[in-house]
Amino acid sequence: MTDLRTEPLSTERNRPRLLYVTAEDWAFLSHRLPMARAARDAGFDVHVATRVQNGRAAIEAEGFTLHAIPFARGSLAPLATLMTLAALRRVNSDVAPDVTHHVALQSTILGLVATLGRRTVCVNAFIGLGYAFTSACAKARALRLAIGAVLRPLVDRDGSIALVQNAEDMAALISLGIPKRRIALIPGSGVDVNRFTPLPEQPPPLTFGFVGRLLDDKGVRTLVEAFRLLRGRGSDARLLIAGTPDPANPASVTEVEAQSWNKEPGITWLGHVGDVAGLWARAHVAVLPSRREGLPLSLMEAAACGRAMIASDVPGCREVVIHEQTGLRFPVDNAPALAAAMERLADAPDLRARYGAAARQLAEQKFASDLIGRQTVELYRRLLAAR
């Protein structure tokens, strides 16, 4: 396979410009940084358009050019939308990107509109089809129809492609009317297998870990309910919950509810955790009871750390948690089934070790950031060559 470090695309003077468009700077740093580094090392001039909070120094330290965009996540207010579109149009005009990589649904729709009439290749990353596809309520169904009507003409055009992380998300986009030829699949955003390395288990008590936003869609309430059932059977297990509420998401847990979990026996809500590898050093088993994922970074990081895993049997999670190989799967939203899976692994150190070793091997072979970076840069190159 091509060594990106030794075959840059062009000279410093005329490097192709790559613009990432994502709603939050922290999301770029947590999920897109490995592929952006791969693109930089392959010869791209990398720009990042995002809502700037605390990530400016880290992004600029990578040699990327940062552009502040007033994204308002969760808002469809006309004025806010127009302000975001205007800012994106200005950035597109100033940067004149050869490739624009939109991340998530809001950035994709607004970004594609902003690129109309521009000569740029568009990679539109769907990183797990969230609330509109996981909820059965009337509002979500209506939103799905609207999304399909808007996306079809925007994505189905020359130089534009939808990027998904699992086959089921590809099928969902096809069901919205997006042609298969306009869809590419790359499994996740990559995990640094040199930073996240196999860790020895800590002494008892047996500890379960959850890393993610505190959303119903992530199954955090199902996890708490299952843990209560487990403790009710006499288990001395512990549960570490790492993550914060997301007020812009209609499925978010409130901070008051999250604080209340700290008062329950065995549960510790940690809030935001910067050192995720350190958390997996404390936990024996990773748990993610999500309703749907693209490809969950928290499980990929746990796998790289050699941790056995438990996850709901849903798109995205299935790619990382292979039942009876890297962990256990259970029916979505089924707290008793989750409690049974937790109890099984709590009592089986040899099984945990076997699953953890297989998980590490899977992370190295399929999800390593170097591999994902190469695949992403190859996609950019292919689209540029066809332009």
Language-model features: locations:
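Short, structured helix-loop element that forms part of the nucleotide-activated donor/catalytic region
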Residues: 54-60, 233, 238-266, 270, ...
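Donor nucleotide-sugar binding/catalytic pocket of nucleotide-sugar-dependent glycosyltransferases
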Residues: 67, 148-198
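Acidic anion/phosphate-binding donor-loop and adjacent secondary structure
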Residues: 76-80, 174, 181-182, 189-205, ...
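Conserved donor-binding/catalytic core segment of Leloir-type glycosyltransferases
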Residues: 200-218, 223-228, 240
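Aromatic "clamp/platform" in nucleotide-sugar-dependent glycosyltransferases that forms part
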Residues: 272, 291
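Short hydrophobic beta-strand element within catalytic cores of glycosyltransferases
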Residues: 308-311, 321
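Conserved acidic donor-binding segment of nucleotide-sugar-dependent glycosyltransferases
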Residues: 323-324, 328-335, 344-349
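A short, well-ordered alpha-helix in the C-terminal region of glycosyltransferases
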Residues: 337, 344, 351-366, 372-378
